[in-house]
Amino acid sequence: MIKLEVCCYSVDCALTAERAGADRIELCASPSEGGLTPSYGSLRLARDRVSVPVHPIIRPRGGDFCYGAVDFDVIKHDIAQIRDMGFAGVVVGMLDEEGHIDLQRMREVMRLSGNMAVTFHRAFDMCQNPMVALSQLTQLGVARILTSGQQQNAELGLPLLRDLLQASQGPVIMAGAGVRLSNLHKFVDIGIQELHSSSGHAVPSTMRYRKAGVTMCSDSEFDEFSHYCVDGEMVEAMKNSLALVDPLVQSA
């Protein structure tokens, strides 16, 4: 069965995605930075209220994936907390200064993760040599790799995604970034078995009073009176589309 993981930036979004049929949730905070580690409150509510597997992201800051000693200490504490809370998996990744997998630190990550399934996130798309990285992550025991095929969106990355699928002897290759209803078939056609989508849209704030001339964001053009939410109807449509093509893939 082709699985759909939905990227969710709140517990409300995770519940919406679950109701719409998502197979798994990647739980994050801060959509404007591409996903950061969610708060303890979000983690606890997601654990208690969401029934499908939830894999929280571990990312202490935005920007690149080359971390200093303090950032790495934060990562280790977050992994231990998420493991002890009983989550099924975790999403993490780190590179060294030359854009290679930070093997020493990833070994520590794998040790700390215990029985959790580890997804190496889109730090993979910033690495110098994806085939070498695939081999290294395989040896580390990573369960899956979330990747756009090292392109701005996964549709542009289809050639590398195909090569990674053919080469992988362990990690699931999960396509993500710009995966939507209109292009699902392109990933299915090359044999992708797991897809990652935010399926998001902006929802206007319920606030009626809106203070003019003051923002909480450094980007004065950013609309702070809307919230990024999962579109449940879109998730449901994507799942229905995958259900139609999956039997054809299985019989091919």
Curated annotation (Swiss-Prot):
The keyword Mitochondrion does not apply. It is found in: Cytoplasm. One of its GO terms (cellular component) is cytoplasm. It comes from the Bacteria. Keywords: Cytoplasm. One of its GO terms (molecular function) is copper ion binding. The keyword Oxidoreductase does not apply. Belongs to the CutC family. HAMAP family: CutC (MF_00795). This is PF03932 family protein CutC. It comes from Serratia proteamaculans (strain 568).
